[in-house]
């Protein structure tokens, strides 16, 4: 059965630790089972802390994103395709590290 989730931007458009905590707490308090984040830069977000909080609250996590023009994997330019693949590799690793399965 599908879980009802909510995008983090419903609660906050930021990615500070306080904003993320508020997002997780509100999502959990209101009975959502999944929280979706736009791509989070692992150099700016404490991924271990976030993964731990997601587990503690019993939430699932998804990450959404789009690729920039210089990362278009359908491009005829191999360097642009390679950049897109690298971006996606980092995104998949982030989802994995957060304990999620949805990108």
Predicted regions and their residues:
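N-terminal pre-domain/capping segments
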Residues: 1-100
């Amino acid at each position: 059965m599908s879980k009802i989730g909510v995008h983090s931007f419903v609660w906050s458009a930021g990615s500070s630790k306080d904003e993320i905590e508020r997002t997780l707490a509100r999502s959990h308090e209101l009975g959502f089972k999944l929280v979706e984040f736009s791509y989070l830069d692992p150099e700016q977000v404490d991924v271990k802390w976030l993964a731990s909080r997601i587990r503690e609250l019993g939430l699932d996590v998804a990450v959404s994103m789009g690729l920039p023009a210089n990362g278009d994997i359908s491009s005829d330019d191999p360097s642009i395709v390679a950049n897109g693949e690298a971006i996606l590799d980092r995104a998949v690793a982030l989802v994995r590290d957060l304990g999620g399965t949805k990108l």
